[in-house]
Design a protein with these regions (language model features):
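Conserved NTP-donor binding/palm subdomain of two-metal-ion nucleotidyltransferases/polymerases, i.e.
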Residues: 1-27, 33-302
Length: 302
């Protein structure tokens, strides 16, 4: 009614593919606001009784009593996670107008599935993700799998670096929900995801870069993980302390200073508390298991 171009995202659309929308739990309603309409969208949301709670990165969070949460997105993907996927999903031309509406857009089945898997991969990379995502994969493929363009999907997933991740997650969904046989790796992957809760856990954010940095047959014990956590390599630190990259040679000499700043911030701001707790408790054998999981999924985000 306000003539604001928008696109319902993620669960706001996925829930309607379940036998009943009530079977698909959502913590919030995600909607992409196209173009320069964020201010107008804010006015409309506030008029409907929503109160702005927080502005973070690529979306604004609104809440309305008793507990309805709307995330108004100005971008479909987080630039800080992977620049390649951010650029891909910044192209809104793949969306089409919803039938009978002028200002509401949707992806066709293929592009919705690509975004669904990219969003899942982002969460897995940053915090791990739960097994509800496997149900989404199963439900979506049961409904649309037979009609989607497989060549298009293969090409797009390859370009986004998501081929291995998608194949493993589809396989795990079939094992879990259709009884397909699978190797021990998939039980390990399922157990890890089950332990992540629905939305992942902060302490799991250590695995993506740690598993990337270790050699295939390198050390897998807790000591190696602790050393990596307390003294991350230059390639990791430069992501969070960009001033190291102004002069790469000098930056590597300044790496100890960045480690010190990071340690002080961790103590003062309480950052990394759950990671440190995990380092104290994790069984050494599980470090090797998680290294294997992240290596096989091949999420090389930059």
């Amino acid at each position: 009614q306000a003539k604001i171009p928008c696109q319902p995202m993620k669960g706001a659309r996925m829930k309607f593919y379940y036998p009943s929308p009530f079977l698909r739990e959502m913590s919030d309603i995600d909607i992409l606001i196209h173009g320069d309409f964020m201010e107008q969208a804010a006015v409309e949301l506030e008029a409907m009784g929503y109160v702005l709670q927080q502005k973070i990165k690529h979306h604004d969070i609104y809440r309305k009593a008793p507990g309805i949460v709307v995330e108004a997105h100005r971008a479909m993907y987080d630039r800080t996670v992977d620049k390649r996927q951010y650029a891909y999903f910044s192209d809104l031309s793949r969306a089409v107008r919803r039938k009978g509406l002028l200002y509401v857009y949707d992806f066709e089945a293929e592009d919705f599935y690509i975004y669904m898997m990219a969003h899942m991969a982002k969460h897995f990379y940053k915090r791990g993700c739960g097994i509800r995502n496997l149900v989404d994969i199963y439900v979506f493929l049961e409904k649309f799998g037979g009609e989607m363009n497989a060549d298009y999907l293969q090409k797009q997933f390859a370009g986004l670096g998501l081929t291995a991740f998608t194949e493993h997650m589809e396989k795990l969904a079939r094992i879990w929900l259709q009884g397909e046989p699978g190797e021990a790796f998939y039980q390990q992957l399922f157990d890890y995801m089950q332990g992540c809760g629905i939305y992942g856990k902060d302490e799991n954010g250590i695995w993506n870069r740690f598993c990337d940095a270790q050699p295939e047959k390198g050390e897998k014990g807790r000591d190696a993980l602790k050393r990596w956590y307390w003294f991350p390599p230059y390639e990791y630190m430069v992501l969070y302390y960009p001033w190291l990259s102004r002069n790469p040679v000098a930056g590597k000499f300044l790496l100890p200073a960045a480690w010190g700043i990071r340690a002080v911030r961790g103590v003062v701001c309480g950052r990394g508390k759950y990671k440190r707790e995990m380092l104290r408790q994790i069984d050494a054998s599980q470090i090797g298991v998680r290294q294997d999981i992240y290596r096989r999924l091949q999420l090389r985000f930059h």
